[in-house]
Amino acid sequence: MKIDVLFYPEKLKNAEDKAVVVLDVLRATTTIATALAAGAEKIYPVSSIKEAFLLKKKISGALLGGERGGIKVPGFDLGNSPLEYQGLKGKTIILSSTNGTKTLKKAVSARTLIAGSIVNAKAVADYLLKLNLDVVLMPSGTDSQFSLEDFAGAGYIISLLAEQKKIELSDQAYVSFELARSNPPEEILTRSFHGQRLINLGFARDVEYCAKLNLLDVVPEGHLQEGRLVIESSRLFR
């Protein structure tokens, strides 16, 4: 199994035979995993606020969730705090965030598309072992810049893979692996630029939650449905 980690979110090349794991640890992919664990049936990642409102008109009962600059979008039902996503049995979520939902849409060419985070790292690693494909871990970054927490998040998943299978790491994947092996998640997240920004905005509890390694046993898997990306709990994980 070959594993690569990207430094920045970018358009994927030659991913048709690979498993791609998109990470937006603070907070979109953590929120997606949390929403599915709380019973949400489907999550539609969208790039723009306008697209979110238009899609809501087509899906009866859907909830709008997301943020811009870390703050809940006016008119949305939910922000991007994973702590808001509780009691969602059977619900459909339309989610738009500054970074993560856009990166997910860049990865639709993958054979298998997964939303990964620290909270579901082991579930994602176990699923990747079942798939037995080469893997690209794709950090979302912050405003198109390198993101410490996403790069380390990839490393925690790699560490779990390395415990169970012989893996071949690219140079970037090796650096990610060593970063995660040497630093606990809570230290990475609180020291990161984006973590500090969220703490200053009043979301310290979010940062603490997003650092909880292996909290959730859920694998959010994306696929195209009528030309639109939708994320559901993987039916193949069990």
From Swiss-Prot:
UniProt GO MF annotations: 2-phosphosulfolactate phosphatase activity; magnesium ion binding; sulfopyruvate decarboxylase activity
Keywords: Hydrolase, Magnesium
Class of the enzyme per the UniProt entry, highest EC level: hydrolase
Its EC number(s): 3.1.3.71
Cited HAMAP family: ComB (MF_00490)
Similarity section: Belongs to the ComB family.
The protein, known as: Probable 2-phosphosulfolactate phosphatase
Organism: Carboxydothermus hydrogenoformans (strain ATCC BAA-161 / DSM 6008 / Z-2901)
Lineage: Bacteria, Bacillati, Bacillota, Clostridia, Thermoanaerobacterales
